[in-house]
A protein has these predicted regions:
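Bacterial N-terminal signal peptides that target proteins for export
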Residues: 2-13
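Bacterial N-terminal signal peptides
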Residues: 11-21
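Bacterial Sec-dependent signal peptides at the C-terminal "C-region" and cleavage site
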Residues: 21-31
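Helical hinge/lid and interdomain linker segments adjacent to catalytic or ligand-binding clefts
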Residues: 29, 38-39, 43-122
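Extracellular ligand-binding/catalytic regions of CAZymes and related secreted enzymes
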Residues: 29-35, 57, 61-64, 79, ...
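Short, solvent-exposed loop/turn segments at secondary-structure junctions
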Residues: 44, 94, 121-122, 189-192, ...
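Catalytic beta-strand/loop cores that center a nucleophilic Ser/Cys/Thr
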Residues: 59-60, 65, 83, 137-212
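A glycine-rich, often tryptophan-bearing local segment used as a flexible ligand/cofactor-contacting loop or short
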Residues: 94-163
């Protein structure tokens, strides 16, 4: 059996497992009736399948109808895309056609939410600036590779981060190119040990934003599924998905941080 066949079989088995779990005991929650599409693929070093296996069952237990795909062609189905409440993408260093990208962007602009983590959303399609504009940022570097670093929550009142403490990760500390029109919920500070000239640089780690009528949630951690063994990391991403899907009680529209606004005064 070739690798493509194996990947396709894995996707089918994963989707079936989630559907069985969902059908067995689907609670009546604020998310009941909402649909989420997980799309995974790209560079396998980011463990996209394992990460999807973390979150797909969690959303099913929240009442979502869950669909899982390994094909960006799913974005071509306009009727399907508009029926969704949320797209969760885990595709690093992929290639997307103009038609696939348009299908995704049109859906988000019309009000479908989008969420993701690490390179699966912020390093997906390096040749597509409009996609990066939609997401609100893109990966630039991870100085030092896998290191220990701290994530500091900056807004403890937001429903996505409420009640959660700062936490440490052993993962890639992403250095990002970030849209100032995002609302930042958590940051990290670079020590400069790998690159001395960035010592003290404070970088967004978690943000939310709008693209048209659609809500976008991004977390820059999640290099591997092990990152989500950290309870705060897993909970932030789960809550971010609920927010992007407009689940009641998950929070309102973002208030952009815009760190440069004081320069215009």
């Amino acid at each position: 059996m070739n690798h493509a066949s194996l990947r396709g079989r894995h996707a089918v088995l994963l989707a079936a497992a989630v559907l069985v779990a969902s059908a067995a005991s689907k609670p009546q929650t604020a998310a009941s009736g909402k649909k989420v599409l997980f799309v995974w693929g790209g560079w396998e070093g980011h463990e996209p399948r394992k990460c999807v296996e973390v979150f797909a069952p969690l959303l099913a237990r929240h009442g979502f109808d869950v669909e899982i795909s390994q094909s960006l062609d799913t974005y071509l189905d306009a009727a399907k895309m508009k029926s969704l409440s949320l797209v969760v993408q885990a595709v690093t260093m992929g290639r997307i056609t103009a038609e696939q990208e348009k299908g995704l962007r049109d859906a988000i602009r019309s009000g479908v939410g989008m969420a993701g983590w690490h390179g699966g959303i912020a390093d997906s399609f390096r040749s597509n600036p409009e996609y990066e504009y939609m997401v609100g940022g893109s990966w630039a570097a991870h100085p030092g590779g896998i290191i220990d670093y701290e994530v500091h929550i900056t807004d403890r009142a937001d429903p996505i981060t409420r009640g959660l403490s700062d936490f440490r990760l052993r993962s890639e500390q992403y250095y990002m190119l970030v849209d100032p029109n995002v609302e930042v919920l958590a940051v990290t500070t670079f020590s400069g040990q790998a690159d001395e000239w960035i010592r003290g640089t404070v970088m967004p780690v978690v943000w939310k934003k709008l693209y048209g009528k659609g809500r976008i949630f991004n977390a820059t951690f999640g290099h591997s599924a092990a990152d989500f063994d950290v309870p705060q990391a897993r909970e932030i991403v789960l809550r971010g998905m609920l927010w992007a899907a407009r689940v009641p009680g998950a929070g309102g529209d973002p208030k952009p941080t815009n760190p440069y606004r004081f320069l215009a005064r």
